[in-house]
């Protein structure tokens, strides 16, 4: 590894971008958060519906599902809305399924009861790491939605069992890096997205060699970086939620 590598962002190899979680960002949703990872900005909302999908009818449990999308000019050039095209891209479907899986990993769906939490993640500005930012922000939005259910007497206890957060890591010019922005992500040798719980359990690891295969040692270094970064994100979630969080 090259210790003298200069990242395009000027950050250390193990340094997150500036991360902010702004709660109660919109008026109507039971939970809403603006999550910012540097120049990546995503609005995450959590909406509660007192019903479940047909496949869960009469099974005594709830459900959590997610949708993901990007504003037409969230990136350097404008993209048509997927609604105008008539279908979602494979990337969109993959990301929203990932967000749903990540949050369900820390929900006791039986304790949630026969209701659904709908997570919506809308990228208003993209500079790399939109899916991981979405997961990190969506957890806080879902937590606030659950708090409202408890306050309304609809839940006796929280169905949330742990925190969950996510981060990107990658190998850039031979050096493992934490929290890739677009300039790094578009040129990295290896790209990996990692989702973990507050207790340190892995929910998902998505890793791809963009050109040169990566070694087991590099994979271990990337996972160590991800674990460190996610630990910082979980602490930020706890800080913004304050007393009464998981």
Curated annotation (Swiss-Prot):
SUPFAM superfamilies for this protein: Ribonuclease PH domain 2-like, Ribosomal protein S5 domain 2-like
GO molecular function term, any single one: 3'-5'-RNA exonuclease activity
UniProt superkingdom: Bacteria
Keywords of the record: Nucleotidyltransferase, RNA-binding, rRNA processing, Transferase, tRNA processing, tRNA-binding
Gene Ontology biological-process annotations: rRNA catabolic process; rRNA processing; tRNA processing
Binding site for phosphate: 91, 129-131
Pfam entry (one): RNase_PH_C
Annotated TM spans: none
Enzyme class, spelled out: transferase
Catalytic activity as recorded in UniProt: tRNA(n+1) + phosphate = tRNA(n) + a ribonucleoside 5'-diphosphate
Keyword set includes Zinc-finger: no
Entry EC number(s): 2.7.7.56
Similarity annotation: Belongs to the RNase PH family.
Function recorded in the entry: Phosphorolytic 3'-5' exoribonuclease that plays an important role in tRNA 3'-end maturation. Removes nucleotide residues following the 3'-CCA terminus of tRNAs; can also add nucleotides to the ends of RNA molecules by using nucleoside diphosphates as substrates, but this may not be physiologically important. Probably plays a role in initiation of 16S rRNA degradation (leading to ribosome degradation) during starvation.
Complex and partners: Homohexameric ring arranged as a trimer of dimers.
Name the UniProt record assigns to this protein: Ribonuclease PH
Species this protein is from: Burkholderia ambifaria (strain ATCC BAA-244 / DSM 16087 / CCUG 44356 / LMG 19182 / AMMD) (Burkholderia cepacia (strain AMMD))
Lineage: Bacteria, Pseudomonadati, Pseudomonadota, Betaproteobacteria, Burkholderiales
Protein encoded by which gene: rph
